[in-house]
UniProtKB/Swiss-Prot annotation:
Protein name as it appears in the record: Integrator complex assembly factor BRAT1
Residues where Zn(2+) binds: C820
Gene3D superfamilies named among the record's database cross-references: Leucine-rich Repeat Variant
Tissue: Ubiquitously expressed.
InterPro entries, sorted: ARM-like, ARM-type_fold, BRAT1, HEAT
One Pfam family it belongs to: HEAT
HEAT repeats: 495-531, 544-576
Disordered: annotated segments: 741-767
Phosphoserine: residues carrying this PTM: S742
Post-translational modification: Ubiquitinated by NEDD4, NEDD4L and ITCH; mono- and polyubiquitinated forms are detected.
Disease linked to the protein: Rigidity and multifocal seizure syndrome, lethal neonatal: A lethal, neonatal, neurologic disorder characterized by episodic jerking that is apparent in utero, lack of psychomotor development, axial and limb rigidity, frequent multifocal seizures, and dysautonomia. At birth, affected individuals have small heads, overlapping cranial sutures, small or absent fontanels, and depressed frontal bones. Infants show poorly responsive focal jerks of the tongue, face and arms in a nearly continuous sequence throughout life. Neurodevelopmental disorder with cerebellar atrophy and with or without seizures: An autosomal recessive disorder characterized by psychomotor developmental delay manifesting in infancy, cerebellar atrophy, decreased myelination, and seizures in most patients. Additional features include intellectual disability, ataxia or dyspraxia, hypertonia, hyperreflexia, poor or absent speech, microcephaly, subtle dysmorphisms, and visual impairment in some patients.
Keyword DNA damage among UniProt keywords: yes
Amino acid sequence: MDPECAQLLPALCAVLVDPRQPVADDTCLEKLLDWFKTVTEGESSVVLLQEHPCLVELLSHVLKVQDLSSGVLSFSLRLAGTFAAQENCFQYLQQGELLPGLFGEPGPLGRATWAVPTVRSGWIQGLRSLAQHPSALRFLADHGAVDTIFSLQGDSSLFVASAASQLLVHVLALSMRGGAEGQPCLPGGDWPACAQKIMDHVEESLCSAATPKVTQALNVLTTTFGRCQSPWTEALWVRLSPRVACLLERDPIPAAHSFVDLLLCVARSPVFSSSDGSLWETVARALSCLGPTHMGPLALGILKLEHCPQALRTQAFQVLLQPLACVLKATVQAPGPPGLLDGTADDATTVDTLLASKSSCAGLLCRTLAHLEELQPLPQRPSPWPQASLLGATVTVLRLCDGSAAPASSVGGHLCGTLAGCVRVQRAALDFLGTLSQGTGPQELVTQALAVLLECLESPGSSPTVLKKAFQATLRWLLSSPKTPGCSDLGPLIPQFLRELFPVLQKRLCHPCWEVRDSALEFLTQLSRHWGGQADFRCALLASEVPQLALQLLQDPESYVRASAVTAMGQLSSQGLHAPTSPEHAEARQSLFLELLHILSVDSEGFPRRAVMQVFTEWLRDGHADAAQDTEQFVATVLQAASRDLDWEVRAQGLELALVFLGQTLGPPRTHCPYAVALPEVAPAQPLTEALRALCHVGLFDFAFCALFDCDRPVAQKSCDLLLFLRDKIASYSSLREARGSPNTASAEATLPRWRAGEQAQPPGDQEPEAVLAMLRSLDLEGLRSTLAESSDHVEKSPQSLLQDMLATGGFLQGDEADCY
């Protein structure tokens, strides 16, 4: 412990135990406890208590003061547990009967403050820290702590109840470590006394008629099997599995959600092998007995296992497919495609759930689609994967939602009415439909998928969220479509689809809802980025009014839309698609740069300006015509606009653009390989000097040095990195250091106050490169980078500052001794 903190500690302990003194808030107490944990990790707790007896006095006074605040009492319990985690310190505290007074009946259990959840939570957390060694087990047994933990499992505070269950698992594992670690225990005996008591309690709870009791027992077992992979857990399952299996005989099955969690946790445990028949028998029974709400998660969990009996995997997959199979049977006159309906008998419970209400029907279908979406990309998914059937079922679900499905039975008619306009199911189905694009399927079904997506995009009743999902799914299908072998054109289905798609996209770009316009622009950007070089796509796009509409949206009243329009137009321009190639559109093609520069200069919102800077950076990096025509003028103009911006992200993006220009001018950063022979880089002085003059001419030095003193730390950090790269790049050329002898740094030093004040030198190109670089080498950029890497409150986070603040709250410090922040 630091001497400064040790000097403040007695006064702080006096403040904490004095009910008349105002105590700092719980956050300060939490930080104080964290500090003590750090201290005890580095030194002996016994030595700490012996050198600072005020800590023992603090714990002793807690037992005597009746009206102590609940926060300080909870802190003291946790602090005592932290000290007692070391067994020798546990014995030291036992000598003074401190621990029985804190954690036994004489302590807070008999006080009125026990009614405060914070105190009960502190008691549990203190015991959790204390229970690290065999002496702690005897202490728990001798003072009835385990029985108190049992009662706290049903606490009215969910946090306390959860912590009690976690503590029970920890005590069980500690008991087994002290007993038969590494050796499986016999079901009938040889359990350590503490473990035996816990197991008896769990068995009793599993047999209880009260569902909360069953839930508590199942949660304890789930946590145990999740945390402990020792052989004794196998004996634990052998002992308790009959009790667990008996829950399936009740109607209704109690705590079904916790029951599923337990089965999956046991199945995932490495202690159990796929040959464990009793476990898989229980799982198979559960798949038959549970309701649809809980069967789906259990089936998904089984299918995600790497090792599982094949018969059980088949059963689980059939359970997972039942809701979609019911949908297909209710809407298809002829038998559906093989694979989905084979072996999937009508399940009365599933049908009842689909017909019960709109919420239950939507919930079941959404969960099923989400489970299948999660399963589809996994290597252990069922094989063969019924791609065609799933595609057909998903299209059918979407048609039920838009009212175009043809019912084949009364169930189908009911589903048509229930799912009509159901946005929740539409979103889930579109997500899964997008995932199915990664698989193969017959051309007829692919055509159906694209058709239903186009209908969703075209339907006037589609909500903004549905349209966004439809755009995303359409993009995935288009990008995954096969191309004609040996040809740069798209496959046979896509050109016609694009000719139908772009008129719909035009309408969505004019939609009154800004979210729809934004989604349409994002779709256009992604499609152009991937397909900008495809002849079919270029022809269809330029034949439409989409580029002109996207250009008009640069003036949209909503800033998010303007930002998306900037990104879209930047991408279209990079591909030569922002305007038709006819001569009458030449002016439109040339004016885009000025339009974007105007947005950067005058737009009142930050999002469009940030988007413009990202577009300009990409243009410079990719050699866009507007950037390549006069690169220095382009960079100078953009940096000048960015330097005046009040948004720190715009200024940071300006530094990114400057770094790109720097790399193009001086070469990319060197790669450092520890195994490579370092060859000296030699560059003629004249070309290097000219390159540096170009950097001065575009105002890069002014911009970077102003940013170095920026009040926003990310900007200063980025500028520091840029200047370090520049300095290291220059340092590799010995010719510059030899050129011109001693540079005159007077002009650069005169400009330094302007840079600190955030002002650029006027004019920007009047600096001598050698003088600027000489000053650059004189700056401690490494030290500045280290300083910038520290958090803004690194001083206030110190333990000494914390103790001073807490003492100041109690009025123990005078003048400016406190470091209140």
